[in-house]
Amino acid sequence: SQNEQDSRHYAEAAKIPMLEPSDSEECKNFTKLAYTISETFDAPAFLRLSTRVSHSQSLVELEEPEEVALKPYEKDAAKYVMMPANAIKRHVVVEERMRKLAEYAETCPINRVESKGNKIGVISAGIAYLYAKEALGDQVDYCKLGMIYPMPKQMLLDFAAQHETVYVIEELDP
């Protein structure tokens, strides 16, 4: 499509993780992390970019490229061909993977809390996080989500419990 679409719903529908960077540096780092998550959990991973992040420019720290050996292709029709008989068996695997991804989301380093003991908290992700930081500065605490699906439910509950008022600042459907 030539116009912007809100792809957040696809992650939940497909039951695969989604990462949302807020700047150029995070785009690079989250791309690498997406591959790591994909290999660890044996699933694809979405990297959600909004127009504002895609068109932004900022300095990026580069590391030395890593050589990664290609794994040999292993034909596995039961895993990759979703005919009804295979899909029924794979559904259990998908649900177990989502449970493990939800656990991972709670400790994932790209989900973080920035707390200075303020009464107001802001939950945000992507470019909306940077907009909130620019507008509100140190007047509020932040829960910055880098992995937006699955969401770190306990982290969000704990963050909300520590604040009198919590705002969610996000980009909405275009």
List PLM regions with ranges.
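Flexible, low-complexity linker and terminal segments
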Residues: 21-174
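Flexible glycine/proline-rich, aromatic-decorated loop/lid segments
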Residues: 1-13
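Short alpha-helices
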Residues: 13-16, 174
